[in-house]
Amino acid sequence: MKTCIISFSSRGNGNCAQIGKLIRSLSEEAVLFQFSNFEIHACGKCGYECFADRSKCPYYSDMEYRLLDAVTNSDLTYFILPNYCDYPCANYFVFNERSQCYFQGHPELLEAYEKVPKRAIVVSNTNEDNFKTALAYQSYKEPDVLFLSAKKYGKVSIRGDLMTDENAVRDVTAFMRKPL
């Protein structure tokens, strides 16, 4: 099964990165993308050229389109998100906003993208509703989300050591093994 994993955290070796590595290690054909490793521009500083022709986007050559291709061509995608102020981090919103250009004038791409099963793992000690709302745009179905609270496992999220707890690893593994 082709699996695409995107970690949206800006911390290269934090909890989200560790979760992504765990998923990759337990999957047969998986690719892990660390969003913060790429220069992906937010929308703006343009004349909305993409609305007429997506290849005219001034940022067309950055990694965004390759990420969207990877998701669209996968059998399963995992989004791994940190909770910043009760919402997904800015990297996730950049990814979501920039997707408009990718799909502009190509409804078949949007349909293929939305059909890919997606699962999200959110590292959060607080709000869940905002994540469910934000993730609802990614799929036809209701978001399949695992919320991992560092507090539940006796950890402090900022330390990035959540995956050192065997119960946290067990919960992620069980989430992965759920039928689609």
Can you say where each PLM-predicted feature lies in the sequence?
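N-terminal beta1-alpha1-beta2 submodule of the flavodoxin-like/Rossmannoid cofactor-binding fold
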Residues: 1-101, 162-180
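Context-gated lysine
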Residues: 2, 21, 45, 56, ...
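A short, structured active-site edge motif that brings together acidic residues
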Residues: 35-39, 113, 149-151
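A glycine- and small-aliphatic-rich helix-loop capping segment at beta-alpha/alpha-beta transitions
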Residues: 97-102, 135-139
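Phosphate-binding beta-alpha-beta segment of Rossmann-like dinucleotide-binding domains, i.e.
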Residues: 104-106
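Short, glycine-/small-residue-rich phosphate/pyrophosphate-handling segment
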Residues: 108-149
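Glycine-rich phosphate/pyrophosphate-binding loop and the adjoining helix
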Residues: 138-180
